[in-house]
Amino acid sequence: MSTEDLYQDDVEMLDDYEEPVPEQADQQQRDDEYAEHAFGYADSDAEHEEQSGDHHESPMLDSLELDLTLRCGDLRLTLAELRRLDAGSILEVSGIAPGHATLCHGEQVVAEGELVDVEGRLGLQITRLVARS
């Protein structure tokens, strides 16, 4: 019997609804716990409700630096319009009210807020945190 025949026999014996192999289940649980601790997101609302009163912070992850971006809207220009831009040009931005911005981690929206002056520098005052799911 060839290796392919043995493999095919194993595949035919598998049930689509079998429980995951213990090692896979353990790895999935570790991955879920890491994501939850690192980003504060739980896989289900029930899990989140259970943990909201008993949230364990991970001191090892507290020093993890994340790249966040502030988005203040969208605009679309033709190449000709882009080439005509010069100092003093004013661009109309759509998708958000003046003075507002969205705080994002990659494509994930984290919060929304209002742009404010912080001792001569631009800041964001959070007005709404996106629900963690």
UniProtKB/Swiss-Prot annotation:
One example GO MF annotation: cytoskeletal motor activity
InterPro entries: FliN-like_C, FliN_T3SS_HrcQb, SpoA-like_sf
One record GO biological process: positive chemotaxis
SUPFAM superfamilies: Surface presentation of antigens (SPOA) (SSF101801)
Location of the protein in the cell: Cytoplasm
Induction: Negatively regulated by HrpV.
Comp. bias intervals (Basic and acidic residues): 49-59
Keywords of the record: Cytoplasm, Virulence
Cellular component annotations (GO), alphabetically ordered: bacterial-type flagellum basal body; cytoplasm
Region (Disordered): 1-60
Broad class of the protein's primary localization: cytoplasm
Subunit-level organization: Homotetramer. The four monomers assemble into two tightly bound homodimers. Interacts with HrcQa.
UniProt remark on domains: The HrcQb-C domain interacts with the HrcQa C-terminal domain.
Function as written in the Swiss-Prot or TrEMBL entry: Component of the type III secretion system, which is required for effector protein delivery, parasitism, and pathogenicity. Probably participates in the formation of a C-ring-like assembly along with HrcQa.
Similarity field: Belongs to the FliN/MopA/SpaO family.
Protein name stated in the entry: Type III secretion protein HrcQb
Originating species: Pseudomonas syringae pv. syringae
Gene (name only): hrcQb
